[in-house]
Amino acid sequence: MTTKSKHIILSLTFLLLFLSTVFSSHVTQRFTSSDDITELVVTALNQTISNVNLSSSNFSDLLQRLGSNLSHRDLCAFDDCLELLDDTVFDLTTAISKLRSHSPELHNVKMLLSAAMTNTRTCLDGFASSDNDENLNNNDNKTYGVAESLKESLFNISSHVSDSLAMLENIPGHIPGKVKEDVGFPMWVSGSDRNLLQDPVDETKVNLVVAQNGTGNYTTIGEAISAAPNSSETRFVIYIKCGEYFENIEIPREKTMIMFIGDGIGRTVIKANRSYADGWTAFHSATVGVRGSGFIAKDLSFVNYAGPEKHQAVALRSSSDLSAYYRCSFESYQDTIYVHSHKQFYRECDIYGTVDFIFGDASVVFQNCSLYARRPNPNQKIIYTAQGRENSREPTGISIISSRILAAPDLIPVQANFKAYLGRPWQLYSRTVIMKSFIDDLVDPAGWLKWKDDFALETLYYGEYMNEGPGSNMTNRVQWPGFKRIETVEEASQFSVGPFIDGNKWLNSTRIPFTLDL
């Protein structure tokens, strides 16, 4: 039996057992009300949380058992899983809290469940390279059996969350209302944050200063993050003065509402060189990893300088909900930005890469950004995006609006030697749209690339709408069932800032132009 077959059977078994248990106490009652279905979902999620906690405990036990026998990448994979399972418990607990509120926002609940599914898949991704790893597979049979059982438990958890996501569809009135059109920042960017984004740096209005020359509170960014308060409900601003900071930065989940302000792209630079080739998982390779919600970055560069031969080497990994990046650059080659999960927004940013250089399963909008393809390795294809939506009910995807898809200076002289594509489907329901953007002539007339064989060609959603430039001609685009020539503003608008990242309430106009809708 294949792993996929086991996954399907486990999913169906769980759903049947769960429903029979719940319905046994309501034999004569029809579950038609919102409250009934909500209680079904809450019961399912509570059981899933118990399963996640058990899996986390088993992962810890196995890690202790294997200890020094593990390769560095396998150690990273275990660390990834323990962190991601902890995040999953948090996401599911938050989802339950929102469901039980007086006016649950089901779009946000779906985002949380989507993030939980992404977490389990990311955990599995970390072990993908371990199938042939002697340190893991050539341990005693009992240990190997436990490892395989843990992998199966992750499939099971993801399946349970998927079932809950399906049940949400049956709650009456779950369809979000019409979005109000306005101009401004998203509702989760407050008035004071808006001023911080617009105005020059005033050191009297920041909480901490990082400076390599000793003129600030700290000389490293890591020290400043450690000094920031936990679970802050107000903005905590860290001004990072001009300089190159060779650090791998992790902003943990408890460090909320952090804001980085630099002195400009190329002037304030955070850089490191972890990579898959050097024994790191893609998740752990990030120069900067952000988990704490409400993160904002302005006027700085995130760089992974591992190089094109090192494979996955992430500059930024963000699972920060309601995070925003303004006038920043992100520079690497393969897997530059890992838009891992939750809702994110990028404005006037420059992104440099070669292969899948924007990837992940967040709900993310790139507006007025420039995507630069760099010179890849010989015979390598250039792919701008690889979106990771694995369930048709996930509200996730990559939306690129009013942006520029270009060749970087190092590619321009030799771009005729390489083929470039807008994206390829990393997962079954991959979803990416490009709207009102300039697409240069480096993009192949087909536009999009297969992942492998016919995988996801019928289930993906790749859309283009009112683009311009020599690469925007759709005459010879792929003929896949999932490719869409978006023809109406109604269809296109669902991927605009308002509906797509839940920006249904906005602030008034600001000095930074920001269009809510198309």
Curated annotation (Swiss-Prot):
Which tissues carry this protein?
Answer: Expressed in flower buds.
**What PROSITE patterns does this protein map onto?**
PECTINESTERASE_2
Q: Where is this region: Pectinesterase 40?
A: 207-504
Enzyme Commission number(s) = 3.1.1.11
Recorded hits in InterPro entries, A to Z, give: Invertase/methylesterase_inhib, Pectin_lyas_fold, Pectin_lyase_fold/virulence, Pectinesterase_Asp_AS, Pectinesterase_cat, Pectinesterase_inhib_dom
Gene Ontology MF annotations: enzyme inhibitor activity; pectinesterase activity
Catalytic reaction list: [(1->4)-alpha-D-galacturonosyl methyl ester](n) + n H2O = [(1->4)-alpha-D-galacturonosyl](n) + n methanol + n H(+)
Q: Which residues are glycosylated?
A: N46, N53, N58, N69, N141, N156, N213, N217, N230, N273, N368, N473, N508
Say which domain of life the source belongs to: Eukaryota
Compartments (UniProt record): Secreted, Cell wall
Name the residues annotated as catalytic in the UniProt entry.
Answer: D335, D356
One Pfam family, short name please? Pectinesterase
Tell me which UniProt keywords the record has, alphabetically: Aspartyl esterase, Cell wall, Cell wall biogenesis/degradation, Disulfide bond, Glycoprotein, Hydrolase, Secreted, Signal
Q: Where is the signal peptide?
A: 1-24
GO biological process annotations for this chain's record?
A: cell wall modification; pectin catabolic process
Positions with a binding annotation for substrate: Q312, R424, W426
Which residues form each disulfide bond in the chain?
A: C349-C369
Query: Which parts of the sequence are annotated with region: Pectinesterase inhibitor 40?
Result: 25-167
Biological pathway: Glycan metabolism; pectin degradation; 2-dehydro-3-deoxy-D-gluconate from pectin: step 1/5
Q: Please state which protein family the record places this protein in.
A: In the N-terminal section; belongs to the PMEI family. In the C-terminal section; belongs to the pectinesterase family.
The entry's function note states: Acts in the modification of cell walls via demethylesterification of cell wall pectin.
What other comment is given for this protein? The PMEI region may act as an autoinhibitory domain and prevent untimely PME activity during transport.
PANTHER family xref list: PECTINESTERASE
This chain belongs to the protein called: Probable pectinesterase/pectinesterase inhibitor 40
Q: What is the lineage of its organism?
A: Eukaryota, Viridiplantae, Streptophyta, Embryophyta, Tracheophyta
Gene name tied to this protein: PME40
